[in-house]
Regions:
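C-terminal substrate-binding subdomain of Rossmann-fold SDR/epimerase-dehydratase oxidoreductases
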Residues: 1-114
Length: 114
């Protein structure tokens, strides 16, 4: 994009956890084959990062040279959202696609679309 900047709500300090959809699909298949209990199982990556870190990572992945403008007049939202994934890990499942790699894959796919 030739845009000079991208506006982002909040000041970038809110922390979020992100999981690639391929990892989610694999986790659901894993649970269908390996879990029969009725207790809830969280599926996630167990790591979080700030919205600022996410924006900077996306900026690098897509080669955006403009500014990231964080607008603190908009809400940050919940300070932190991260799941306890110890149960699914103890069953033997772990995510395999790191966030940066997943972002790169999705961007490459998107760029290849007409």
């Amino acid at each position: 994009s030739n845009a000079e900047s991208v506006n982002i709500w909040g000041n970038g300090t809110a922390r979020r956890e992100f999981l690639h959809t391929d990892d989610l699909a694999e986790a659901l298949l894993f649970l269908m084959e390996n879990y029969a209990d009725s207790a809830i199982v969280n599926v996630g990556c167990g790591e979080d990062q700030t919205i600022r870190e996410l924006a900077e990572t996306i900026q690098k992945v897509v080669g955006f040279s403009g500014r990231l403008d964080f607008d603190s007049s908009y809400p940050n939202g919940t300070p932190q959202k991260i799941l306890d994934i110890s149960k699914i890990n103890s069953l033997g499942w772990k995510p395999r696609i790191p966030l940066k790699e997943g972002l790169h894959q999705v961007y490459q796919w998107y760029a290849a679309q007409d």
